[in-house]
Amino acid sequence: MPISVDKAVIARLKVHGETFEILVDPYLARDFKEGKEVPIEEILATPYVFKDAHKGDKASEKEMEKIFGTSDPYEVAKIILRKGEVQLTAQQRREMLEEKKRQIATIIHRHAVDPRTGYPHPVDRILRAMEEVGVRVDIFKDAEAQVQDVIKAIRRILPLRIEMKVIAVKIPSEYVGRAYGEVRKFGRIKKEEWASDGSWLFLIEIPGGVEEEFYEKLNALTKGNAQTKLIERKGL
């Protein structure tokens, strides 16, 4: 169900001296600008393109055709979202910024380790480092796409090494059913085979920061009966 008009915010695009506005759900608009697949009908509070949303002054089909090459309001709305600015409230901007920072810090926590200990830094420590160096985070840009820039910035005060680990695992046959899908969530299976007794043997490549979590999950799934061996550590 589309957001109500009173809770929507304005997305605005100024082009060729003209202003075009739409009323949008701020959070779905953010997701759309990040590149996620969100139906435009769900983002819009109303299926109209305005010259001035506050006054209810709608853009004519002729105006839209002239500027955008189409009079379809949904297609025009997509262009406004991609190229224009979403007018967030101060609270919305603050909430989205904190959420985006935590997403980035969580990705770093999972993929990087402290080279001095081999263990990942806690998310809160990464967040403090981001704050200390004054990292600039883009609310409307995907978190994954910002990770490398953030790592470069915080490495000055927080030692980090991006690391992948390859682990050999053997899971007894009686636990394979429950473990098969869960294990694959951690990384990429590089090689697998089945032993004569039904055990599952495989090599899995996982981010360095989730190694302990991976072992804990394996132990829980197999009641401590899984066998593991670290085969390779690869710094990136």
Swiss-Prot record:
Transmembrane region(s): none
GO terms classed as biological process: cytosolic ribosome assembly
Source organism, top-level taxon: Archaea
Similarity comment: Belongs to the SDO1/SBDS family.
Protein's recorded name: Ribosome maturation protein SDO1 homolog
